[in-house]
């Protein structure tokens, strides 16, 4: 496909190419797919995005994304409210939910800490986490940050931060490969990592 001179189409391709996992070639294919059946494919996508923009909010408790200020996980009476899993982003929360093996609550950090940069730890929402641990009488905190250098740095920082709370602190099992991110692992691997979690000090 030759480069187009249409700036609007160029912009559409550029926006798609910025999505995770997509390069410029994949972005071109997606744009062409939508434009070839504009009345159905493109309009359906636009309508869905408009609805998502209107309805989706961040859970005021855990940081998940849902249609209510308290997400369906936090509000569910069937979850084990004595356990919290700490994840870096909503992507990792979704990965644990797909495993079907975790029935506790979550706390989404939204970021991680780099061992080489001077990021402010306040970005991790840890005061809110500590408040939840005391208010909800949490018995176990599972640190489910990724097995990257940043994830490990974040895990150690969280452990130090939570020392004043008596909850058991555990880490997902080492079956997750070094440098691995939960969102890219299959459900069986994530499920095993949850089951085989180890105390973390």
Curated annotation (Swiss-Prot):
Keyword Calcium: no
Disulfide pattern: none
Residues in Toprim domain copies: 82-177
Zinc finger extent (C4-type): 59-74
Domain of life from the UniProt record: Bacteria
GO MF entry, a single one: DNA binding
Keywords: DNA damage, DNA recombination, DNA repair, Metal-binding, Zinc, Zinc-finger
Family matches, as InterPro entries: DNA_Rcmb_RecR (IPR000093), Rcmb_RecR (IPR023627), Rcmb_RecR_Znf (IPR015967), TOPRIM_dom (IPR006171), TOPRIM_RecR (IPR034137)
GO BP terms: DNA recombination; DNA repair
Keyword rRNA-binding included in the entry's annotation: no
Role this protein plays: May play a role in DNA repair. It seems to be involved in an RecBC-independent recombinational process of DNA repair. It may act with RecF and RecO.
Family: Belongs to the RecR family.
Protein's name according to its UniProt entry: Recombination protein RecR
Gene (UniProt): recR
């Amino acid at each position: 496909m030759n480069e187009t001179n249409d700036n609007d189409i160029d912009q559409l391709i550029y926006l798609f190419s910025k999505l995770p996992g997509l390069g410029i070639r994949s972005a071109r294919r997606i744009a062409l797919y939508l434009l070839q059946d504009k009345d159905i494919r493109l309009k359906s996508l636009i309508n869905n995005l408009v609805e998502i923009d209107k309805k989706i909010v961040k859970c005021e408790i855990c940081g998940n994304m849902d249609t209510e200020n308290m997400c369906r996980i936090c509000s569910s009476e069937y979850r084990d409210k004595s356990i919290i899993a700490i994840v870096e982003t909503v992507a990792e929360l979704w990965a644990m939910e797909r495993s079907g093996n975790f029935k506790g609550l979550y706390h989404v950090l939204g970021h991680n800490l780099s061992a080489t940069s001077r990021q402010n730890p306040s970005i991790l929402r840890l005061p809110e986490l500590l408040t939840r641990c005391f208010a909800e009488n949490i018995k176990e905190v599972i640190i489910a940050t990724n097995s990257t250098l940043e994830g490990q740095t974040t895990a150690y920082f969280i452990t130090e931060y939570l020392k004043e709370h008596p909850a058991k602190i555990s880490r997902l099992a080492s079956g997750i490969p070094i440098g691995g991110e939960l969102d890219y692992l299959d459900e069986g691997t994530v499920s095993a990592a949850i089951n085989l979690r180890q105390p973390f000090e």
